[in-house]
Amino acid sequence: MTDELAGKVAIVTGGAAGLGEGLVRRFAAEGANVVIGDIDRDGGAALAAEIGDNALFIEADVAEIDQVSGLVSTAVEHFGGLHVMVNNAGVSGTMHRRFLDDDLADFRKVMAINVGAVMAGTRDAARHMSKHGGGSIINLTSIGGIQAGGGVMTYRASKAAVIQFTKSAAIELAHYEIRVNAIAPGNIRTAIVRKSAAGADLQKLEEFEAKIRQQMRDDRPMKREGTLEDVAEAALYFATDRSRYVTGTVLPVDGGTVAGKVIARK
């Protein structure tokens, strides 16, 4: 590790597990003071305790806008500033349901968390950063927001919205030296899928996952699944001064999936 984030303060929403946990651990290892925002009280508190004094857990439901604001104000109060904001928290919505059977309740929930919380987190972080020399805002989207496809259509729409919001915010906030970028992971194996599918038939879920993952491995130029470390490396780049002239960028971390499918050679 290089201590690239020594003296910096970062917030990671949805930081108690999955991709968020990977980012929290990497940022802390690089010397950052990290605020973990999550609804998982036990998981978040345990992670903060494991990391030590440079981590703080705040129980927060990002679907509630005022709780997003509370994350920023608490981070500034506790650690003395805010340099990096990672809007990572997200949900997939109801899985294995046909679009014709979707309802507005699911749509509203997905949009509130995947889009509304990203907008609120960006706004509240930027309000502080604009008065203190700038900073970096990193939004987690998905290759599902880049490529069209059947299934989880509300999720895809929400992630596409994050991409356009990121680019627009980057333009508006560049004057303040605030960089806004997005990471679009693809096929990163975490526990988040199982959490979001709570209540679903576990056997059917496992069969569905296995089928989709095999199909994606067959189509992807790089024949492996991505890791938390792959995403953390991208986030570290955006969080540090190495990306000081990079804003409005959407970086797929997907083994080449969005570049195109592999054509079988005989």
Briefly describe each language-model feature range:
Residues 127, 171-175, 244:
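Alpha-helical segment proximal to the catalytic Tyr-Lys
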Residues 122, 158, 166:
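Active-site helix of classical SDR
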Residues 95-99, 103-108, 216:
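Substrate-binding pocket helix/loop in short-chain dehydrogenase/reductase
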Residues 184-200:
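Short, flexible catalytic-loop segment of classical short-chain dehydrogenase/reductase
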